[in-house]
Amino acid sequence: MADPTFAATSSSTSFRGLHERLVAMTQELAEERRHKRGINSSAGANKRSSSTPDGSVLKNDVKQQLAKERREQQKRQQEANKEKQLLEKEQKAKLQYEKQLEEKHRKLKEQKEKDQRRQASAEEKRKQKQAEDTEKFKAVVSRTLERCNRIDQRQKRWSWEGGVMNADKSGKLENKRSSSLSRKDNRLHPRGDMQHVDNTPGMTKYVFRYVTAPVFSSDEIKSSAMFCKPSAKTPVAAKLEKITTKKLDASLRGHVEGLSMMNIEIPPKITIEVPSPPKLEESSEADAEVRLQTMDDISKVKEDASQKVDIKVPTDENIARHPKPNVEELSPVSVDTSSSVELSSIVSVNSSPSLSTGSFSFGSVEISPVVSIDASLETNIDTSPELSMDSGNTKVASEIKTEAPLQARGESRLEASVEGQPEANVEGSPKNPEIDKRNINLTTKKQPLCHIPCYRWPSSSALGCRPPSPLKALQTRKIRPPSPIPVSSKLSTKTSLSYKITPVQNVLYVPNSLGVIATKKETIQKYPIKKEFGNRSMPSAEAIKKAFIQIRHAAYEQSKNEKERLQKEETKQRIARKPEIMAEKLDKVPAEGSLPCQDEQQDKNPTKTFLESPEVQKAELQKGDSAMMKSRDSAEQRKKEQENILQHWQERLERRKASEISFSSEDEADDEGESEDSLEIFPSGGKMLSMKLKKFHKYAKTKPQKLVFLQSGTDEVDTNKNVYFNGDMKAVKQKDPKYSMIQGKGSKLSAKKPPTRPIRSRKTKEGSTAIRPTQSASSNPNHKWVCDKVIDFNQTPFLKTTLTKSNKESPADSKIACQGPQAHLDHRKRTKSVSVPLTNVLSHLHITGRASNLEHPFASVYSRLAFGKEAEESDV
């Protein structure tokens, strides 16, 4: 808004100039805006020129424009500052990232340098340790070699009493035990262990004591054997080079007996060539002197002689080259010092601490011509004071010597000991051709019992004890790995094959089902449903049931067809011979009663039908089909006859309705016709009689009727009975049955009937009310219905069921006494309607319907109608 005071006080000239400038500026700005917006500037200029703007308005516009410019400039400056800040931040981040990368590289370099220095130091330490170990090992080897050389140089003298020998013995024991265990053992057992008991010039006695031998492993023995180079500076004393080889097994435990002149030598194969002096043949005394003189010469020669330790030479090659030592038999005075004696002693373990030398299996030690020790199987020590060596002793020694490498080789295989066999072949020089040419044939002794290899001994479990069970043998065979020794595997297979493995057979126990069935068939008449057979180990229970049901069904169909065929034949015969049948049935029981017995006999033996072959069953089924066709034809014929009879009855009833005046005379004739027709219908089935009797239900309503109760045990009538009809109690009065008259008979068959039976007519529905109480009393459809008496009902037909004795015994095979409703007859007709012969016939006649198999579910029922013997009169 413009300020009025400011406009009034300002001068006109200054105001006009300023106004013009402002107008020009505004126009320029407006034109620029129009150019920007695309609006025509001329129209706008005309309009503005027409309306001159006010000064206050122009001032405000300028202020706003200037403020806007300032704001825009500030914004541009702020944006520029922001861009600068962002650039600076980016530069700083780059610099920081570069610094971090440099630090990482530097750290990695430092870590690598540290690792390298650590590896270098570890390598230096390892090398130093290895060098120290090698130095220690070399020092140990050098000490052992020095000890060996020192001990070999000690033996310079020979004594008849064996003092030097003892020193040499103990020294060699110390020499050969190069480990710390041997040094400890030497400290525990000094050299003074072997002492002379009696030092006499003629006899030398020794005290044998047990020496604890260290247990060496094969690696220790090999390492010590490789660097052990024994020198041959030991002189030959009295023909015997006392270099004995001993085999130390890895499994050696306990104490080892040491003979006085036996050494334990670890190198497995040592071949030493010893030059022998010329042969001396002098007296015993001169021989002893010469022997003492030649000891120094021999030792000097041995120092110059080359000693070879042949580790790579196999055992068999050494034995082949020197199979037999050359020993010359001399006189008792002379001794051949150049003879090569090979001593191979096998040291075994003796657990007993006794001082017997039995633990040595072989040992031959010759000390001198004076003292000769022959350690044979019994290791007997023979010390002779004479100055002669027996040739027999030499022979025994050589035999034992040749035998020892063989057993050493056998034991090295079995006990996994050092592979090299200890063998020392002391070869004589070729200066004595006579000794080389002469060879003594040595006989190898039989191996003693203690040196039979362990795998040849039969196990105590296989020989001494009772033989194990084959199941345990199979289990051990599965658990144990196969033995590498072939003999043990053969022995195990022999012991396992010597027993026959008898597997346990699961014998199925089949019970005596025939006996059980025979006992159950005695009550087959009482129980209509037969139990199934027991399991005869057939494939499955369902298959057995199906097969059994099919077989029984086939047997049932066959029996049914047979019975129908018999019934048809009987009906034909009875129709043909009606008067004869009437005469016979007055005196005899009908033959049809035997048919149920036949059915029962067939039911008693179902195993016969079950055991019949399939071909017989097929033939029976074919016969049954043909019989079914015949039975259908006969059923159609019977149906036609029944229709004719029904028409006849209807005509009679119509006549009775029409002529009630002459009812009595007509009824007599009708009754006679009824009796004849009933006899014709009876064989075809008892159903037609019930159908005929049901026709009279419509007439039963016209006259009062009575209900008669029969006792179950006896056929007597209960007089004192109260009957309730819909809540009303009525006393039933019964007269003597002798004066009662038969008014009708009726029976009810089962609801289940095959399709061959005739269909009921409409008239049967009238009697359905009388049957309902019987169905409620007995649910089983297979019942035998007996019409015992004829009853008059006072009101609606009512039925009372009573159980007989058979029902008490078996509820399934019950016979129900049925008093069916009967048509009402005139009182005049009842007095003379039925003749006496007819009542007798009806009393004895049992009319059988279709034969029924009570045990089969498809069986139908047959009814038996029994009538009273005399006519019965009932009160009206």
From Swiss-Prot:
GO biological process, one term: microtubule polymerization
Skewed-composition ranges (Basic residues): 750-763
Gene: Map7d3
Protein name: MAP7 domain-containing protein 3
Residue ranges with Acidic residues bias: 665-679
Domain of life: Eukaryota
Ranges of Basic and acidic residues composition bias in the record: 60-139, 169-196, 559-590, 630-659
UniProt organism field: Mus musculus
Keywords associated with the record: Coiled coil, Cytoplasm, Cytoskeleton, Phosphoprotein
Tissues where this protein is expressed: High expression in lung, skeletal muscle, brain, and kidney, with much weaker expression in spleen, small intestine, liver, and heart.
Location of Phosphoserine modifications: 417, 483
